[in-house]
Amino acid sequence: MKSRIRFVLPFVLFGAGPAVARDNQEFPVQWKVGTTYVQSMDMAQEMTMPGGQGGMQTQMTMKVRAVPQKGSKEGTTEVTMTYDAADMTLKMGGNEVPGGGEALKALVGKHVTSVFNADGTIVEIKDMEELLGDDPMLARMMNEDSMKQMVSQASLMGKPDRPVSPGDSWTFSVEYPMPMMKLAMKGKYTYEKDELVEGVECARLVLDGQLTMETDAGDDKKESDDPQAAQQLEMLKSMGFKVSESAITGVMHYDFALANVIKTEMDMSLTMTMKDPSTQQAMTLPMKTKVSNTLKAQAEK
């Protein structure tokens, strides 16, 4: 019996057991001045094409270095986010598309500044023109609202409207006008439990939601500035493009000490429907996406 006690005691002393549950949490997201953050993102996406034409696979990786400083407006924090790495591989029917990742590679070394309010909600993106440069492909892929979406996906898309405890849930709803359509997400977070992640005490938050896209509510400014984008939008409308089914599930780990989300695993599945432009026959395009995000923090020396 004594040897068994000696074996168990170190685990108790050094906290190898489960984390103690915390009540009345609001999960504020903080970007602390004097800390440098490194965020890594990996995305894998696959779309199935009809009629045995082969599918489309996309692999994307990004690494962003984030340095916060006190904002110019009271109660805000401005976080300069520099792209240290960005790459994408695109395959059609199993064959790699040459130059598929060139637009993303052009981001390396560039930066944007994200402005957050006191509770960590992103309110503004600065320096978008510098980030996009004169690349029309990047301009069609990204704007301020889509950048807000990417930043939000790595954190909480909606915070609780009241203090919550393990077992509680809350809903969220967000909209992001994109260059050629409007993207909307709605869903529910559940504060499932507390657990240790690599020795760090975290809240495990479970996500369950849906995604919608509307081609009638795109970014009008982008359409007028980019004739090719406007032409592509009209083509989508004429094809009756819509999302008929969608599901988003995921798990996030919120670090209590850091006051930020340090790990995100998210799965998205969509079923898109449209008409074949040559035959006018209805097409169904299932698409699956897996996104992983990690956040590391290091105090400035």
Spans of model-derived segments:
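Signature of exported/secreted
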Residues: R22-K301
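Sec/Tat signal peptide C-region and signal peptidase I cleavage site
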Residues: G17-A21
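Bacterial N-terminal signal peptides
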Residues: V8-A16
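Bacterial N-terminal signal peptides that target proteins for export
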Residues: M1-L9
